[in-house]
């Protein structure tokens, strides 16, 4: 098995060092924005009064919608440079959406015996995110006219 750093080395060499650094910068820049948006949503929407983390749900649903909007744009022939795609989809949307926090919240609900809340969380996040991605694609079609 090849060591992970050797895979990175081969990737750098294949893309050319300049292209790789631009890609890393694009993903990193988008991730900084996406992670801060997710954090802000949590501060704004989460409270200790209820067991549902509305900030996490809002992050996943809005990220799904944004990915759908971007995919709709690309499917209609819209073009961004590869670096802008990495910034928007991999960086921003990838850091905005959060499978790990969602998973932790579901497992915590299960451990507390709140099975209906766990199932509701799974349905809201998974079905909701898929629905919002489809809605994002549809939204782009409506906006494009």
Kindly label every feature range from the protein language model.
Residues 2-145:
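Membrane-interface helix-loop junctions in multi-pass transporters/channels
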């Amino acid at each position: 098995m090849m060591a992970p750093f050797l895979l990175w080395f081969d990737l750098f060499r294949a893309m050319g060092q300049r292209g790789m650094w631009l890609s890393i910068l694009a993903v990193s820049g988008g991730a900084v924005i996406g992670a801060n948006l997710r954090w802000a949503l949590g501060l704004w929407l989460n409270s200790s009064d209820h067991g549902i983390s509305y900030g996490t749900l809002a992050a996943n649903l809005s990220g799904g919608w944004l990915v759908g909007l971007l995919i709709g744009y690309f499917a209609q022939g819209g073009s961004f440079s590869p670096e802008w795609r990495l910034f928007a989809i991999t960086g921003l949307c990838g850091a905005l959406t959060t499978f790990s926090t969602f998973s932790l919240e579901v497992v915590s609900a299960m451990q507390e015996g709140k099975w209906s809340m766990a199932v509701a969380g799974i349905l809201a996040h998974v079905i909701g995110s898929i629905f919002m991605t489809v809605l994002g694609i549809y939204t782009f079609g409506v906006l494009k006219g």
